[in-house]
């Protein structure tokens, strides 16, 4: 993994990162030989902005992730898989954080992903399953610093996941969904346990039914 960044006096920090990964195979070919690992390469270029006079952090990034040597159906028509498949994903990531006051913090994020089978016996040009193009979230929390409830933090947020393809053949679509989350946290420093807290996180507070 490699990362290059440089912060300017105005609070702008452009950066570029490159990383590689691999995933060992667990299947074998027609001769009983274990397949070679699949490999991943990711490029990311972005900008982070932290103004000197305001508690705000804004980031934006473009990325491309390519996964090669994936298993795919044998073009010869056998029941065995062969190596050589490739999936590429390109996208945009945006995030903003702000402390509106000493007690109030908010976070918002958005991700756009364009994923495609670039090399595959059966699925070339299709979108991989369960990869939504759009995802977004908003979160806010409020912390009490005075009174009998001092140290208590209450938070809530909304997460949106866009529609996605349900299978590699793209024969059906899984619908989008939105869920609400919540948080209650108490800082135990108020009872002599500095550095510790107890928290309750509730995902999907409204018990929304959805397919993921």
Stretch-by-stretch model annotation:
Residues 10-14, 53-58, 103-106, 147-152, ...:
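Repeated loop/turn-to-beta-strand initiation elements of outer-membrane beta-barrel proteins
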Residues 43-44, 129-212:
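Conserved C-terminal beta-signal and adjacent last beta-strands/turns
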Residues 14-19, 37-99, 111, 115-117:
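Membrane-embedded beta-barrel scaffold of Gram-negative outer-membrane proteins
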Residues 2-4:
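Short, small-residue-biased leader/transition segments that mark boundaries at the very start
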Residues 25-33, 70-79, 113, 117-125, ...:
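Outer-membrane beta-barrel translocator domains and adjoining extracellular loop/strand segments
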Residues 18-24, 51, 62-68, 90, ...:
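Transmembrane beta-strands of outer-membrane beta-barrel pores
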